[in-house]
Swiss-Prot record:
<dbReference type="GO" id="GO:0016052">
    <property type="term" value="P:carbohydrate catabolic process"/>
</dbReference>
<protein>
    <recommendedName>
        <fullName>Deoxyribose-phosphate aldolase</fullName>
        <ecNumber>4.1.2.4</ecNumber>
    </recommendedName>
</protein>
<keyword id="KW-0456">Lyase</keyword>
<dbReference type="GO" id="GO:0009264">
    <property type="term" value="P:deoxyribonucleotide catabolic process"/>
</dbReference>
<dbReference type="GO" id="GO:0005737">
    <property type="term" value="C:cytoplasm"/>
</dbReference>
<keyword id="KW-0704">Schiff base</keyword>
<feature type="active site" description="Proton donor/acceptor">
    <location>
        <position position="90"/>
    </location>
</feature>
<dbReference type="InterPro" id="IPR028581">
    <property type="entry name" value="DeoC_typeI"/>
</dbReference>
<dbReference type="InterPro" id="IPR013785">
    <property type="entry name" value="Aldolase_TIM"/>
</dbReference>
<feature type="active site" description="Schiff-base intermediate with acetaldehyde">
    <location>
        <position position="152"/>
    </location>
</feature>
<dbReference type="GO" id="GO:0004139">
    <property type="term" value="F:deoxyribose-phosphate aldolase activity"/>
</dbReference>
<dbReference type="GO" id="GO:0006018">
    <property type="term" value="P:2-deoxyribose 1-phosphate catabolic process"/>
</dbReference>
<keyword id="KW-0963">Cytoplasm</keyword>
<dbReference type="InterPro" id="IPR002915">
    <property type="entry name" value="DeoC/FbaB/LacD_aldolase"/>
</dbReference>
<dbReference type="Pfam" id="PF01791">
    <property type="entry name" value="DeoC"/>
</dbReference>
<feature type="active site" description="Proton donor/acceptor">
    <location>
        <position position="181"/>
    </location>
</feature>
<comment type="pathway">
    <text>Carbohydrate degradation; 2-deoxy-D-ribose 1-phosphate degradation; D-glyceraldehyde 3-phosphate and acetaldehyde from 2-deoxy-alpha-D-ribose 1-phosphate: step 2/2.</text>
</comment>
Length: 215
């Protein structure tokens, strides 16, 4: 096994993903010993069936991709996803509240969802494409203060994805207290490796097979 495979959340979040593609994603994750598959909630149950006797985790997304659902809706989505078999939750923060510096709202949202997660991993997507440097620092400090496990760069649906400078910034703020997931537009091994070296402990990509088999 490639030593980098364990960092991978093998991702398929496109709106027109087919059941056959989900099955293939799961097979690839098992064969390559990726950490998880990251899929939309409607596929969690079937992916759990495919991966039942493997070590591959099931990761799904909440409030995706805009983050604009109410807290109550996100809490329900989270509980439902876990009931269906999700091991990890990648939630999109309320981006408007984050941009406007509403610390109390952001913390309340994250912590309510983490309460439902229990011992399941919670990653918080802050969609860096919409944030300036000061807002990225604020986002990291929110995560540091919250009960979340990870901060995550992007949904993959915005105009920009992961940037090395953001991983470096967050690692400086978070240290080893919280983890970092880089995602969005990661298509080559050089970027993949540089994100890990900068402090990311998980990489979300739909191109993992190409990236890791060709380096």
């Amino acid at each position: 096994m490639n030593k980098y495979n364990i960092y991978v959340d093998h991702t398929l979040l496109k709106a027109d993903a087919s059941l056959e593609e989900i099955h293939k994603l799961c097979e690839e994750a098992e064969e390559n010993e990726f950490y998880s598959v990251c899929i939309n909630p409607c596929f969690v149950k079937v992916a759990k069936h495919y991966l039942l006797e493997t070590s591959v985790k099931i990761c799904t997304v909440i409030g995706f991709p805009l983050g604009a659902n109410t807290i109550e809706t996100k809490v329900f989505e989270t509980k439902n996803a876990i009931d269906l078999g999700a091991d990890e939750i990648d939630m999109v923060i309320n981006i408007n509240q984050l941009i406007n510096g509403n610390r109390e709202y952001c913390l309340n949202e994250i912590n309510q969802i983490k309460e439902v997660c229990g011992d399941k991993i919670l990653k918080v997507i802050v969609e860096t494409a919409f944030l300036n440097r000061e807002q990225k620092e604020f986002a990291a400090k929110i995560i540091l203060e919250s009960n979340a496990d990870f901060i995550k760069t992007s949904t993959g649906f915005a105009k920009e994805g992961a940037k090395l400078e953001d991983i470096i910034l967050w690692k400086r703020i978070l240290g080893d207290v919280k983890q970092i997931k880089a995602s969005g537009g990661i298509k080559n091994f050089e970027d993949f490796k540089s994100f890990i070296e900068a402090g990311a402990t998980r990489i979300g990509t739909s191109s993992a097979i190409k990236i890791l088999n060709n380096h």
